[in-house]
Structures are given as C-alpha cells and as structure tokens.
Amino acid sequence: MRINQPDEVFILTPGPIERLGGMERFLQYVARGFEQRGFGVRVFHSENTGPRFWRHPNSKRKLEWLLAGSLHGYYIGRAAREALHSGVRLVLSNSTVGWYPLNGVKRAQYFHGTYRGQAEAIRPFIKHQGYMKLKWWDAMVLERFSGKNTIALCCSETIRAEIYRYFGYDAHVIWYPLDIDHFRPLDMKSCREKLKLNAGPVGLFVGSISPTKGFPVVEQIARENPQLTMLVAVRGPLPEGIHSLQNVRTIQDAGYELLPTLYNAADFSLSPSRYDAFSFVVAEALSCGTPVIASPHGASLTFYAEPPLEQLLTASTDDVEGFRRAVRNVLSNPQRWRAVIEEKVRPRLKQMMAPENWWRRFAGVVGL
C-alpha cells in the first residue's frame, strides 16, 4: 500500500452514479457531501473496471447473465484493492458488488432494500428462474456476503428488519439525505403555468413501470377520473395502454431541476409500489408539501404513523378501492391536505433527512 496519500473514500456500486434512480441519487448526495468535507472520492463500477465484454451482459443468455453478476463484484473489488492506500478512510459499497475481500480498511455496506424481499414481493410477475436468481444468488450469496464483516447501513426500519431476518446482520437505520431547500413548497399556480396545465385537479406519478412500482394502479386512477390531469414522469418506456388516455401527460426522464415543479403542480402523488425500501420520490413530494397516496412500504410507513395521515395509506398495492377513496379524500380539500403535510411531515423529514442532520448521523455510525 502507498503512504502519505490524501484522505479518500471509495464507493463500490454496480453502475455509474450519474444515472437516474434512487440508489444513484443517494450516491450523488454522498459523493458530493464527502467532497465538501475535504475527502477525495473514487467511484468503482462495472463500466470503469474489468473487460468490456462483461459490462453489458445479454439477459437472454442465462449463463452469461449469471456470471456477469459475480464478475462485476470481482472486477470492481479488485480495482479498489489495487488502488488502496493509507489515506482511504472508508469503502462504501451497496447491492451485490461489495463481497470482494479488502483487508485493513474500514468498510460499510448500504442496503437499499434486499433482493430477497424484492423477489418475494414481485414473485407473481417474474419467471421462476428470475425469482430463484434474485432470491438465492443475488440475495443469499452476493448481497449477504457483501454485508459480511462490514458496518451494515440501511434506509428504513422495514429494511432493517429484512436484513436481520434474511442475513442475521444488525443494521443501522440512517435514512437518506435530501436537499430540502431544493424540494420545498412552491406556488402551485406558477408551477402549473410553467407546465401549461389546464384548470382542474392534477395527479402525479414519478418512477418507472417495473413490476415493483405498481403502475397499473396509476393507469386505473387516470382512466376512472377523466376530469383529472395525470402527470406521468417515468424512466424508460411506457406501456402501450397509457397512450389511449387523453388525460395523461407523459414526461420521460425528468431532470432534477424539473422535479420540484412537478411535485408542486400536483394535488397528490401516487406511490403504489409492491416493494420500496424508502422511496426518494415519496420523500421529495412530501418535502414539497404534496400529499402522497401510497401502499405500505419504507417511506409511507415511516411518515404516516399518526392521524389523519393514515388516510393516505392503502392496505396494499392491490387495494384499488383504497386508492380511489384516498384520491377522493384529497381532492375534496387539497389545500387542507397540503397544510397537514407541511405541519406534520415536513418537520420530521427535515430532522431525519436534511443534509447537516443526516451527515452527523452517518459520520457517527461509521466513525469518520
């Protein structure tokens, strides 16, 4: 190992952190926060380590796909080991790429959920092979060993319970950091004018159409409420059925700067996820004062623990009547619900997720 090097933090993650996504958003916050505190940051991922052939495996070639999941962790870990020096204060990994042995350095594994929990939640919607891979290979082998002999971190009490149940690790709940000055209440009328929205109620969905996100609920609410303008901000392709709905306006790959405008233009946001460790889009919407109608998952269970907020929580993703009832409830008095969110949720969210508070908690847990 080299000596007399400046303090650095290594981040080990499956792909580039510049992409859209909750895990990537978290790592962008963390990398920027380390740099602001005087640390150098190096990010090791599948596209800057290892042979090009293994960077984008063909999911239709099952053996290649399976091997790539293991080899990403090997090449990422090997590159990190070769770069280690005496100034590396922490190696922070996540997902399935933190299992490579790195001796003599402090390590932490951040669990953004578990693949085991995700596999169980979406089992009816994926092939048996995919379920078995998620449950046994990704979760019980790669993810479990990625957390072994590290400081285990996670984003909610729900996920802490999963980690202990499946892996036997006692994780620290540290939530996520969130820029609450960026995601703040804005003038609804101005936001709607920017988006050129018609008069009338506005709903919102931000996310993807993967099986975990419960997108059919969004389609159904839009179809049953033609008077409602439904904003749908998604990553990736849209299902064909959505194009036939005249009251749906789609925004693909919405940028970070646009998100507060979207949240503040809406009377409510929908989060019907089957599995969500702690959804950034829920926290972002709530930080803007926007009520989120949600199935039970990490973020909704965290913030909707007291009256009248439980009225925004459905029994499950499949509780369509619960979503209908909550939509009617919010639209009957949208300003009242905004006031409830700003009074009861935003102060707690600030305490948990404001960057200065989050960093104090994180630094204490990992010993920096």
PLM feature spans:
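Aromatic "clamp/platform" in nucleotide-sugar-dependent glycosyltransferases that forms part
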Residues: R274
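Acidic anion/phosphate-binding donor-loop and adjacent secondary structure
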Residues: L178-K194
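A charged, aromatic-enriched C-terminal amphipathic alpha-helix characteristic of glycosyltransferases
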Residues: D318, S332-V366
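Membrane-proximal helix-turn-helix segments that form the acceptor-binding/catalytic region
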Residues: G130-A152
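Nucleotide-activated donor-binding/catalytic signature segment of Leloir-type glycosyltransferases, i.e.
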Residues: P239-E257
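Short alpha-helical donor nucleotide-sugar binding micro-motif in glycosyltransferases
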Residues: T261-A266
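Short hydrophobic beta-strand element within catalytic cores of glycosyltransferases
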Residues: P291-A294
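Carbohydrate-associated surface elements
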Residues: T158, P177
